[in-house]
């Protein structure tokens, strides 16, 4: 059974056996966040919430409960067992090196996310993420500071660019690249890979390549004396300190100037672009292969929801959604087939997951703007709006299904708003 078929099986048949088949870490996290709902009868649940039935005189982690009120005591509309929908970067260990750190949320931590893995990385000013390449595409969003990125095309042409908060880059699979923190305080960024099981240890590092090649072969290949490579690192560098580089123009000249310049643009100014959709409730900025041609396998949206606003009810027919919460507080309900639904809470630095075709909304439950990223292992961003569907069907059909008459139907927004 391939990955897509296994995911579809989990969604369509969210059985106890599927749930118990997940890793022990995921099960612990799921229990920790209250992400598995027991079947509830709405009337019984509503009555229980008003009497002594929901009291908990025993032990509790109040700080955690305060962050996850809907995860612990879900609304009565929740029902059944579902796949894990939540994790947090604050629960995973940091790999700390001189020059920065990294940590990851992958399929191991969030087993339902088979298509995407995420990393959060920090580089101090001048420090490098070692020159490397890997088997997955790398899509990144800058959360803080500034960085310089380089990537070489297979034809030998080079792209060099500087990025800052709100910008992104894409490195295609197999293309060698590097990242360096700039002044005054380096950078922090989110990395998204289109392989759910991708690992920070699964990259091909320049230092390791050189260390594992016979010196005489390196000499023959490069034309350098074999003794030159005696000073090469014997251990992986991965993240290591360096000196803040000079100007971007100087680096471009140093590598060969226009003669070796890439025809392709690998960076994009996402936060500063005009919103794709905007309303009183917030905005959505979409980036995919249509406006960023280099990003052929990863699409994304930067969503801002005002207090009390709502990322409208919708679903994605072409890909599962991997979310990263940058700021604010939110709750999300995800609807699954066979009468299953689950509501979970999110805070900054959390990760959310929604299987393809699962209906959901994201509501701002805080008093500041909610800011998050939606990412997809796809070339295009595609979503289906519930409101738009309800307005497009004949009024008699809507009346027959939901008892909404024609006059009431006219009050539903006719166009896809993105945020309400």
Regions found by a protein language model. Name each.
Residues 41-117, 217-306, 312, 388, ...:
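A short, N-terminal "cap"/entry segment at the start of jelly-roll beta-barrel domains
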């Amino acid at each position: 059974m391939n990955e897509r078929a296994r995911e579809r099986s989990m969604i369509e048949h969210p059985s106890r056996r599927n749930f118990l088949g997940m890793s022990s870490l995921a099960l612990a996290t799921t229990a920790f966040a209250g992400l598995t709902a027991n079947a509830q009868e709405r009337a019984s649940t509503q009555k229980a919430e008003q009497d002594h039935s929901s009291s908990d005189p025993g032990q509790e982690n109040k700080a955690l409960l305060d962050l996850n009120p809907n995860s612990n005591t879900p609304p009565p509309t929740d029902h059944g067992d579902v796949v894990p929908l939540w994790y947090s970067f604050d629960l995973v260990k940091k790999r700390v090196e001189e020059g920065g750190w990294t940590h990851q949320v992958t399929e191991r931590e969030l087993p339902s996310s088979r298509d995407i893995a995420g990393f959060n990385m920090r580089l101090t000013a001048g420090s490098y993420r070692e020159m490397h390449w890997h088997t997955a595409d790398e899509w990144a969003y800058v959360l803080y500071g500034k960085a310089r990125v380089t990537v070489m095309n297979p034809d030998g042409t080079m792209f060099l660019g500087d990025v800052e908060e709100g910008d992104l880059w894409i490195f295609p699979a197999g293309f060698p690249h590097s990242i360096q923190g700039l002044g005054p305080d380096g950078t922090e960024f989110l990395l998204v890979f289109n392989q759910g099981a991708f690992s920070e240890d699964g990259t091909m590092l320049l230092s390791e390549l050189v260390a594992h090649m016979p010196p005489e072969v390196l000499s023959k290949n490069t034309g350098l004396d074999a003794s030159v490579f005696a000073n090469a690192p014997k251990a992986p560098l991965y993240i290591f300190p360096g000196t803040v580089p000079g100007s971007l123009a100087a680096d471009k000249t140093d590598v060969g100037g226009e003669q070796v310049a890439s025809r392709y643009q690998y960076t994009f100014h996402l936060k500063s672009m005009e919103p794709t959709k905007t309303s009183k409730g917030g905005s959505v900025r979409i980036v995919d292969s249509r406006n960023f041609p280099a990003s052929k396998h990863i699409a994304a949206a930067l969503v801002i929801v005002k207090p009390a606003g709502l990322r409208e009810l919708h679903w994605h027919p072409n890909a599962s959604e991997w979310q990263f919460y940058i700021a604010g507080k939110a709750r999300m309900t995800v609807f699954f087939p066979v009468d299953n639904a689950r509501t979970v809470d999110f805070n900054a630095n959390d990760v959310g997951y929604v299987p393809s075709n699962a209906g959901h909304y994201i509501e701002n439950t805080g008093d500041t703007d909610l800011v998050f990223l939606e990412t997809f292992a796809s070339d295009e961003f595609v979503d289906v709006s519930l409101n738009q569907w309800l307005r497009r069907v004949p009024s008699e059909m809507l009346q027959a299904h939901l008892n909404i008459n024609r006059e009431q139907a006219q009050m539903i927004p006719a166009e896809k708003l993105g945020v309400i």
